[in-house]
């Protein structure tokens, strides 16, 4: 698995016994697979599912009931911030961790305005996701 093979470990203890569910929406098969493998190795978390399109992300959210959706802002056909708004409008919406290749203060502000709970740059995905999850679930 990616997490163990690369030596990554999340020392964050769980405050309860419940496993948190993470879903991933990303159009890149390689990134989606790597992210799924990392999530599968995270203590206290379980992979709820993956999809390669933004529109299928809504179906995944409604069917799998994740606690967190990792959403690539570039996933077609509906782009970025509009998709964050759609997901957050769903009843019982999960936390949305937006992912981007261009992690800038402007991108973070725009993602926050759209309703994203965190923004993670893909260039620092492991550290960024670990930090975002620690903030979302202290």
PLM segments and residue spans:
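Conserved acidic segment of CheY-like receiver
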Residues: 19-30, 35-39
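Short amphipathic alpha-helix used as the core "switch/output" element in two-component signaling
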Residues: 81-92
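Acidic catalytic/metal-coordinating carboxylates
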Residues: 53, 79-82
